[in-house]
């Protein structure tokens, strides 16, 4: 089973950016299989919508390092771990810029990028970037079309509702062909259908506590059905599970969630956000926790 960890990107860690390189290097030395970033712009004073699955807007989202910059640092200081995003909010970005950033990081890392994308959920963040939230689904779909075009063969050309690219040359392509694997987060029927029709895999999320396999298996049943309807092989779709933690969670509890996901939901790749809700208070603390999680999981 592959085990990874989020880079120290949010909250107090954002004020110590040197920790990104330090954690990435040491996580690789311990044998971590993947390193991950998220994508947040701001923490509203009076949020209209709270973080999915919670009743609050996490305070650590008040400070967040740029995900592309953090992944670039990790790409440069490591040689083996996969480098993923969970998730980049695709509708915020002009596809040529998103395609270029991910292709560049894939080049710098020697082909280790996992492009984890989502539709977004914060109305305040959508307003901040000037994108109508009501268009997020259609923009997301067009973004996926455009990424495939920009990462494909030259000449590149795209004509859509939101973006248009006249025929031209884009010679910086991802090392991975036809592009980095695209994994999507999804919480709605439409989102799950999108995963089945368009993606290489699904990015569910859980928190430590009693693990319920249907958190993974329920959506995957709908996703695989959508894949079959689209003429795709449903068994080719992967699952990478995100485990969000919070202060007070035990290392044994975290490892138990990962192991139950492996044994009861056939999850073969999971990553743990040790800095979510301030479980790890420093890079040294995060390294210690990561090492203990790795030891517990690999012992079983």
Where are these regions (language model features)?
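Active-site-adjacent structural elements that line small-molecule/cofactor binding pockets in enzymes
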Residues: 1-300
């Amino acid at each position: 089973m592959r085990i990874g960890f989020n880079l120290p990107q949010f909250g107090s860690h954002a004020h110590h950016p040197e920790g990104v390189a330090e954690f990435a290097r040491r996580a690789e030395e311990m044998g971590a299989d993947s390193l991950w970033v998220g994508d947040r712009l701001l923490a509203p004073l009076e949020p209209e919508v709270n973080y999915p699955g919670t009743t609050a807007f996490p305070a650590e989202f008040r400070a967040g390092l740029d995900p592309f910059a953090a992944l670039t640092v990790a790409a440069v200081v490591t040689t083996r771990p996969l480098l993923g995003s969970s998730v980049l909010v695709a509708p915020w970005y002009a596809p040529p810029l998103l395609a270029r950033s991910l292709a560049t990081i894939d080049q710098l890392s020697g082909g280790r990028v996992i492009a984890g994308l989502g539709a977004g959920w914060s109305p305040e963040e959508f307003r901040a970037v000037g994108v109508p939230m009501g268009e997020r689904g259609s923009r997301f779909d067009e973004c996926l079309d455009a990424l495939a075009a920009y990462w494909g063969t030259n000449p590149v050309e795209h004509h859509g509702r939101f973006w248009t690219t006249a025929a031209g040359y884009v010679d910086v392509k991802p090392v991975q062909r036809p592009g980095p694997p695209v994994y999507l987060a999804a919480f709605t029927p439409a989102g799950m259908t999108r995963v089945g029709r368009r993606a290489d895999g699904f990015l569910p999320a859980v928190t430590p506590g009693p693990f319920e396999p249907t958190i993974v298996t329920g959506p995957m049943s709908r996703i695989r059905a959508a894949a079959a309807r689209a003429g795709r092989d449903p068994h080719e779709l992967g699952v990478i599970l995100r485990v969000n933690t919070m202060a007070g969670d035990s290392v044994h509890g975290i490892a138990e969630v990962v192991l139950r996901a492996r044994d009861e939901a056939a999850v073969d790749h999971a990553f743990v956000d040790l800095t979510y809700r301030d479980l790890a208070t420093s890079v040294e603390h995060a390294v210690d926790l990561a090492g203990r999680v790795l030891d517990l999981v690999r012992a079983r």
